[in-house]
Amino acid sequence: MRVVHRRRGDVIAKKATIIAVTNQKGGTGKTTTCENLGIGLAMEGKKVLLVDADPQGSLTISMGWQQPDELPTTLSTLMAKAMNDQPIQPGEGVLHHAEGVDLIPANIELAGLEVSLVNCMNREKMLKQVLEGAKYDYDFILLDCTPSLGMLTVNALAAADTTLIPVQAQYLSAKGLEQLLQTVQKVRRQINPKLKIEGILLTMTDNRTNYGQQIDNLIRGAYGSKIKVFDQTIPRSVRAAETSAAGKSIFAYDPKGKVAEAYKSLAKEAQADADRQRKLSSERAR
């Protein structure tokens, strides 16, 4: 993870690390990972903003706002302001969750906004403009991307420092990685040259079976020499699948379960990466 600093007089201000949690395939545990990694980082004492960048509003619903269409301000509202050069007030549209993270919610209006982005000048960078005012208020900003490679996902990749890719431990999910990696490379070349791949996270794993071990070995063998594959994997669990309906994170719903422990370890692994990058960035800023 990359942490950038800027000087304000004699004070160095830290900018949030922005992570796009993305996979164009649905059902990979993307929303679950965004929510629980964010709350795991908050449990480590970090200030975290989650951004629901999916018109389905899955992250919004999963975090307990069961009627996203009734929310007065969502990501669509803020991106429309950016498109029309209207000011966005500090904290506008931000919801506060009981588990210590903030959320910019989404609903179906975001689908209509994605269509209008096509005719917008600087269309790939509207989300980046929305986040401009928040990036010095948080340690981490996590973007839950839509399961497609459309304009909203491109906006997320254009705004991000890194992308984290959850991949379900199945053969077809592993095969779909190549298309996403090509999109990341294209965004890096044309829009955001600083974009890095945070890593591939294996989700819904079951290494008790030969098949599960084969998929793990397949992905690590195919990509591990070029891209980080997180040591920590997220095991399959019925309890984890129940959290969305409960409107709670895995830490609140099943705090002693294996999935909670896995996300806790993932947060520590991610934080260790951030600490290393922070040290390097501080040395370069001197």
Where are these regions (language model features)?
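P-loop NTP-binding core
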Residues: 1-286
